[in-house]
Amino acid sequence: SKIALDNLAHEIALAIRETQVFGVASKEATAGSSIFPTRGAHFDKNQNTSFVLFVDVDDNNKYGGPSELIETFNIQRRNYISEICGYATPSSNCTPLDLLDLTFTRPNPEPAVVGRVGTSEALYSYATITITSPKGISRNIVIWSNGQIAIQ
């Protein structure tokens, strides 16, 4: 239903926002280490009914697999991620992405927006994640370069 899709869009936006908060206000990895781990959210077009929150252990602004996993969010009710877009500039068109990593590093609330198409990787100004219901209703979660997260 439309309400369930709206709720899902808000859940995804909230998960990204929590990742942002934990990344910006993170504790030291080990007391006294002065190492503050980057946090991120990972979206994969081929895993379109889930997404991952992670700690960027190797500090490369992308998800490195199970050793970096914090939590996997499963998308319910046959809703799915139908499109992931990267935008090089605020006025550019969508570049459809295979993978998207949004990472937040203390003290900056602005995300690093890293997208991949095949083996080609690029930094983007901002990104959108489109979720779609079985009835074809869609919502966009927009992650702006200034750290704002919106639902359209």
Q: Can you say where each PLM-predicted feature lies in the sequence?
A:
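N-terminal helix-rich module
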Residues: 1-21, 25-152
